[in-house]
Amino acid sequence: MQLPLALCLVCLLVHAAFRVVEGQGWQAFKNDATEIIPELGEYPEPPPELENNKTMNRAENGGRPPHHPFETKDVSEYSCRELHFTRYVTDGPCRSAKPVTELVCSGQCGPARLLPNAIGRGKWWRPSGPDFRCIPDRYRAQRVQLLCPGGAAPRARKVRLVASCKCKRLTRFHNQSELKDFGPEAARPQKGRKPRPRARGAKANQAELENAY
């Protein structure tokens, strides 16, 4: 009689334990691997998507590098450095009473934003293109008075001085002494050239010799 009573007590204890587990839910039940079993019928919510998610494979800025804070919108502008030169105007033995000041376009073309005293801006169409030079752009006329030795009467003369410079590029169609300007007008095809006649082959020459006989 004691054995059946003990079995009944064990069954009651096991039943009570299962009741307690069902009351607390499956989350309180752990298996041997110490893994929490999720509740049946419920699915874990997906993690919220970050607004500024940079791990996604998305093209940002149109596939271009981000805008540099020091770069201006018009970074294609290039200009010459302003160089002043003072000289006397001479005409034979006569020389001007006062020196004249003009610009010398011998500087190297560079970004206009980096040149504080830049003049005459041009467009840099291709950074890896041909060579660029700084050449005179506009001139101004100035009248100077020349003094001649020997007590001769002074005389006036009009000279042309450089007023501004600009950047021009060398092209592969010209040598380095010829410069080409920017813009769509620079890409004009050369007119007046006739196509070269094709050289005749040896077979054509042989046929003409046979017909000559």
UniProtKB/Swiss-Prot annotation:
Residues 82-172 form the CTCK domain. Glycans are attached at N53, N175. GO terms for cellular component: extracellular space. InterPro entries: Cys_knot_C, Cystine-knot_cytokine, Sclerostin/SOSTDC1. The keyword Signal applies. Its main location: secreted. It is found in: Secreted, Extracellular space, Extracellular matrix. Residues 1-23 form the signal peptide. Residues 41-71, 178-213 are annotated as: Disordered. Disulfide bonds join C80-C134, C94-C148, C105-C165, C109-C167. GO terms for molecular function: BMP binding; heparin binding. Keywords: Disulfide bond, Extracellular matrix, Glycoprotein, Heparin-binding, Secreted, Signal, Wnt signaling pathway. It comes from the Eukaryota. Residues 190-201 have a biased composition (Basic residues). GO terms for biological process: negative regulation of BMP signaling pathway; negative regulation of Wnt signaling pathway; ossification; Wnt signaling pathway. Interacts with LRP4 (via the extracellular domain); the interaction facilitates the inhibition of Wnt signaling. Interacts with LRP5 (via the first two YWTD-EGF repeat domains); the interaction inhibits Wnt-mediated signaling. Interacts with LRP6. Belongs to the sclerostin family. Negative regulator of bone growth that acts through inhibition of Wnt signaling and bone formation. PANTHER family: SCLEROSTIN, SCLEROSTIN-RELATED. This is Sclerostin. It comes from Chlorocebus aethiops (Green monkey). The gene is SOST.
